[in-house]
Regions:
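Short, high-confidence coil segments that cap the C-terminus of an alpha-helix
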Residues: 56, 78-79, 180
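Extracytoplasmic metal-acquisition and chelation regions
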Residues: 74-78, 107-108
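Bacterial N-terminal signal peptides that target proteins for export
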Residues: 1-6
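Periplasmic-binding protein-like
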Residues: 80-84
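Acidic, polar ligand-binding/catalytic clefts
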Residues: 88-99, 104-106
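C-terminal motif of bacterial Sec signal peptides marking the signal peptidase cleavage site
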Residues: 12-16
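Exported/periplasmic ABC-transporter solute-binding proteins
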Residues: 17-52, 67, 71-74, 86-87, ...
Length: 250
């Protein structure tokens, strides 16, 4: 009996001293997505959807002006997927052999004006009502800026903005914070701002559309996953998310 008790005690002590199994340290696969700043809300949502269906994968985003992202790719910045807010910037990327295969058109977007709640400056459109007001637009080198310039020319309006931003989300932020009387943004940004702003339609805005394209970066180290992410964007789930955000589907 004593021997049995000693044996049981020894076994218990041995079990207590045995280290617990080490937690899994398998590294997660990181998928790097470069995307236009106007896609920040929708692509963040798409990233969560993708991670949910791909255990062990983390989607890392870099949101910026499309032209800035192309420059970064040219300089060798590592990325797996690139989504541009207009065709000219994607063309720059493909011409420089930065993309693998043919990028896919997945959405279009148009411009509108946002103003602080109540429209205290009395803005009526992209017209003389913005003269002398604190108007903020995108810089001409980025898609929303190029579209703004085209639309202003179409309407015969000369704009004198107090600030030109490299990201459309920065234009939105300045209106939301009351730093600007009006800002020219995409309709998707106006929808994302919600009750923080009022929206003023721009005449003939539907005549100046920006096309959004997405593709796999040529130097991607995760091209299979990158292609699957692109498939999500252009598939039914991705298109639903984009449509809900206000994008027009191709």
């Amino acid at each position: 009996m004593i021997r049995a008790l000693v044996a049981v005690t020894a076994l218990a002590l041995l079990s207590a001293c045995t280290p617990a199994p080490a937690p899994s340290t398998a590294p997660r696969t990181e998928l790097v997505v470069f995307a236009a700043s106007s896609l920040s809300d929708t692509y963040t949502s798409l990233g969560k959807t993708f991670e949910g269906s791909h255990p062990g994968v983390t989607v890392k985003f870099s949101f910026d002006g499309s032209s800035t992202l192309v420059d970064q790719l040219k300089q060798g910045a590592p990325a797996d997927v690139f989504a541009a807010a207009d065709r000219p910037n994607m063309t720059k990327a493909t011409t420089a052999n930065l993309m693998s295969g043919t990028p896919s058109l997945f959405a279009t977007n148009t411009l509108t004006i946002i103003v602080p709640k109540g429209n205290p400056a009395g803005i009526t459109g992209l017209d003389s009502s913005v003269d002398g007001k604190k108007l903020v637009i995108c810089a001409d080198g980025v898609p929303c800026g190029s579209a703004t310039t085209k639309l202003a020319k179409l309407l015969g309006v000369t704009l004198k903005p107090v600030s030109q931003e490299t990201k459309v989300t920065d234009v939105r932020a300045k209106v939301e914070s009351g730093q600007a009387d009006a800002g020219v943004v995409y309709v998707t940004d106006a929808k994302a701002a919600g009750s923080k702003v009022d929206t003023i339609a721009i005449k003939n805005a539907d005549q100046v559309k920006n096309e959004y394209l997405v593709g796999v970066v040529a130097t991607s180290k995760n091209s299979n996953l990158a292609n699957q992410f692109v498939a999500l964007v252009i598939g039914s789930e991705g298109q639903r998310i984009l449509s809900d955000a206000g994008f027009t589907l191709p």
